[in-house]
């Protein structure tokens, strides 16, 4: 745009031109002012633009800084979240480690306890095995001795059988010679001769059974049952004839007399025996006569002077028949023992006028007194050998004890307690209320109330562990122990002087006491 400040107006211009020039000058001034204003405005705008640009750059820089801070904050937050997660995981891991350590210590303690208990049980089992081994060795030695004694007794019985055959031959010869003098006794003589051979052989066989211990209980039960089959309706036994060996002379007279003298004596004794047969057939005894099939069959026993009533004893009851055989076993043992000693004395004194190989062997055996003294049979003390005890064990003892359900006893402890009960060696003592054992649960039924506390403790041996027991379980234990003690008394012959009816009534009372203690009605539980 041209600069108009240096333009000069010519003096000799036309007025119209002057007017036009004045207007142009005014317009020029106006335009100049506008131009100046526009320039100033542009400069201001440039300044403002520069300022805004600078401000924009500052804002952009600030935005970049804030964005950087924001991204850094986001990454920090993420790292912080990760840190919190890791911290929680660390706490969980520490908790698991503590739990694992406590569990490890508990398992180690249990392992130590189990190891100690295992060693104790192993030592106890080894000790029991050693005891059983020693007992089995003793039993084997006893069986060997009994076998030797059985062989000795067998040779003795064979010698007796040979002598009895000689006596039978001599009696038959004398019978043929004196048949005309004694015609009524011919039939009786043959009957007696048959009974002599058969009865002596049966008695010898039963003595061997008792000595060797083979099937003793079965043979006794079978003999009792077979004898009970001959009972009549009223319960009385038929008249039983005595064994012919009962009428023989004493050992002194037999050793001092010859064969002919013994034949005459036997003939006189046959007359007396026939008289006894006639008297027994006409007037049978009121009480049953028991003729034992043991070697002591020469003695007539009448153990029960009064016949028991049918309400107390029932011969059709298998349980009573088993108890009858169990009750008679000690008496049979005593009779067989005395009869065996008598037969041994008889076998040691052979006739003087006869010498045979069997008598020579008998004289050789008689010179050894230890063999005759050691060959006396021993009575069985084991209750398990009797069928009556097996019945009571199944029907009364096991339901009363219920040791299989005893939660506080281990298997070995149950076995030792049951063995102690059968051996009558169980120990039951009262407990004081301040004892630590009284606050423990009952070992048999698990009774664990605080009121009342356990008042008793029991153990199988004096040096064994004590077990707490409540009053109910003690009543059961005592009832079973009383019954087992009663059976041991019968085995030892304490009840031999009493009648069968009295022993049977006492047995029923003991079994009833076990039932009452089992249902909780024992006398110890009253009140």
From Swiss-Prot:
| Transport listed as a keyword | yes
Claim: Hydrolase is one of the keywords in the record: no
Composition bias (Low complexity) maps to: 271-305, 362-376
GO biological process terms on file: exocytosis; intracellular protein transport
Q: Where is this region: Disordered?
A: 233-305, 342-376
Q: Name one GO molecular function term.
A: guanyl-nucleotide exchange factor activity
| Coiled-coil parts of chain | 40-171
The UniProt entry's GO CC annotations, sorted and at most eight, read: cell cortex of cell tip; cell division site; cell tip; medial cortical node; meiotic spindle pole; meiotic spindle pole body; prospore membrane
Where is the PTM Phosphoserine found along the chain? 75
Task: Report the Pfam families cross-referenced here.
Answer: Sec2p
> Per the record, where are the segments of Polar residues compositional bias?
256-270, 342-361
* Record InterPro entries: RAB3IL/RAB3IP/Sec2, Sec2_N
Alphabetically ordered keywords of this record = Coiled coil, Guanine-nucleotide releasing factor, Phosphoprotein, Protein transport, Transport
What does the similarity note say? Belongs to the SEC2 family.
Q: What does this protein do?
A: Guanyl-nucleotide exchange factor for ypt2. Catalyzing the dissociation of GDP from ypt2 and promotes the binding of GTP.
What is this protein's record name?
Answer: Rab guanine nucleotide exchange factor sec2
What is the organism field in this record?
Schizosaccharomyces pombe (strain 972 / ATCC 24843)
Please spell out the taxonomic lineage of the organism that makes this protein: Eukaryota, Fungi, Dikarya, Ascomycota, Taphrinomycotina
């Amino acid at each position: 745009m041209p600069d108009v400040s240096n333009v000069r107006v010519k003096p000799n211009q036309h007025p119209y031109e002057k007017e036009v020039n004045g207007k142009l000058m005014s317009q020029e001034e106006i335009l100049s002012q506008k131009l100046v204003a526009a320039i100033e405005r542009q400069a201001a705008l440039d300044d403002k633009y520069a300022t805004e640009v600078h401000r924009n750059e500052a804002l952009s820089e600030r935005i970049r800084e804030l964005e950087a801070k924001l991204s850094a904050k986001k990454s920090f937050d993420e790292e912080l979240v990760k840190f919190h997660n890791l911290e929680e995981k660390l706490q969980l891991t520490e908790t698991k480690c503590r739990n694992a350590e406590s569990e490890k210590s508990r398992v180690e303690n249990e392992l130590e306890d189990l190891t100690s208990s295992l060693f104790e049980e192993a030592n106890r089992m080894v000790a029991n095995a050693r005891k059983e081994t020693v007992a089995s060795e003793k039993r084997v030695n006893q069986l060997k001795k009994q076998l030797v004694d059985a062989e000795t007794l067998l040779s003795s019985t064979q010698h007796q059988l040979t002598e009895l055959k000689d006596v039978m031959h001599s009696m038959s010869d004398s019978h043929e010679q004196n048949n005309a003098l004694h015609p009524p006794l011919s039939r009786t003589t043959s009957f007696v001769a048959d009974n002599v051979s058969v009865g002596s052989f049966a008695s010898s066989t039963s003595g061997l059974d008792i000595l060797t211990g083979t099937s003793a209980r079965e043979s006794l039960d079978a003999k009792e049952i077979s004898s009970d089959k001959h009972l009549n309706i009223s319960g009385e036994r038929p008249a039983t004839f005595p064994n012919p060996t009962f009428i023989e002379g004493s050992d002194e007279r037999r050793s001092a007399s010859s064969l002919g003298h013994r034949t005459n004596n036997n003939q006189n004794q046959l007359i007396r025996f026939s008289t006894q047969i006639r008297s027994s057939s006409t007037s049978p005894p009121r009480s049953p006569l028991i003729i034992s099939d043991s070697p002591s069959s020469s003695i007539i026993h009448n153990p029960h002077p009064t016949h028991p009533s049918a309400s107390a004893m029932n011969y059709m009851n298998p349980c009573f028949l088993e108890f009858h055989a169990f009750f008679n076993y000690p008496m049979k043992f005593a009779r067989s023992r005395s009869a065996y000693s008598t037969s041994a004395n008889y076998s040691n004194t052979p006739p003087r006028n006869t010498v045979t190989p069997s008598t020579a062997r008998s004289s050789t055996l008689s010179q050894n007194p230890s063999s005759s003294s050691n060959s006396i049979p021993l009575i069985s003390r084991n209750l398990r050998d009797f069928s009556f005890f097996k019945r009571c064990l199944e029907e009364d003892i096991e339901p009363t004890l219920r040791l299989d359900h005893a939660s506080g006893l281990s298997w070995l402890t149950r076995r030792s307690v049951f063995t102690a009960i059968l051996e009558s060696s169980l120990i039951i003592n009262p407990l004081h209320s301040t004892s630590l054992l009284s606050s423990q649960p009952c070992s048999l039924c698990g009774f664990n109330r605080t009121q009342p506390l356990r008042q008793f403790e029991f153990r199988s041996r004096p040096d064994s562990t004590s077990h707490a027991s409540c009053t109910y379980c003690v009543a059961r234990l005592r009832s079973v122990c009383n019954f087992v003690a009663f059976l041991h008394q019968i085995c030892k012959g304490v009840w031999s002087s009493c009648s069968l009816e009295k022993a049977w009534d006492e047995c029923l009372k003991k079994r009833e006491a076990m039932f009452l203690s089992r249902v909780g009605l024992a006398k110890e539980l009253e009140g």
